[in-house]
Amino acid sequence: MATARLILSLLTIGLSRARVEESPRRVLSQNQSQVFVNLARLPIATPACSAARWGRVLELVHHLGAAAHEISAKFRDEGFWGVFGSHYHGAKVNFMWNAICNDEQLANKPSLQVCEIGFNAGQSAVLFLESGRETRVLSFDLGDYPWNKKQASTVKAAYGERFDIIFGNSLETVQNFVAKNKDFKCDVAFIDGAKTRQIRNQDLKNIRRLSTVGDTLLLFDEATTMECMNQGDCQSTRQNHNSWGGATLAYYDAVSSGLMKILDCAWPVGMEGADGVCKARYAK
């Protein structure tokens, strides 16, 4: 009888261990978009801009990236084609987060309206949405990747009325939005759409129409050198005009014309002078 009880106890322990070991696998096999939505809907107990809140952002972004990969295997990296790309080692997103959290002018606002050109998989939108309880995000995106629209639906399900997106060519959609919403203003604007000089120039000008001179915090990606953007030597940038260089030459144009003033930039280690992110304000 004692032997039988011992065998039964061992079997029970074995089954319990099996259940514990299976639990992580069940979590990983869940639909990642739903995991993201459930997590985003949890009550926020951490202060805005705290280290704990940033940890929440990273967890949300992880699941949102996994959701994009479930849609298409082409979304290969957790932050594929975006500022959360693993090869940036957090340099870009940390700069953006700190730019918002440490800006004295933004600190005086009860809530923020963020506008971005370039939604991709929605990870930058989540960064902005998590920066404050009442922060709202309006995204403009071409919608030409297989994950764009499903990811937008996922972010919408998580944040409701705080998030909206308009699909189409930003050269048309932003202007159309301005024409119909003349009093709408962005407290923060992030430009990370098409990389060519011509289109980036127009995106800067269009977003200016949704901004307040000297007040709206402007963030932009694909910066090569501070020297070039501030009307200095652009030789290396011009040689790279078919890549990020096109965007940087647009920043050169914007500074030269007095449209904006660059405040600061950051580059991932090993990418200095090649692919950074900056903050600025419109000057006129």
Over which residues does each language-model region extend?
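Classical eukaryotic N-terminal signal peptides for Sec-dependent ER targeting/secretion
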Residues: 1-8
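A short alpha-helical cap/connector motif
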Residues: 4, 23-190, 194-284
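N-terminal signal peptide
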Residues: 11-25
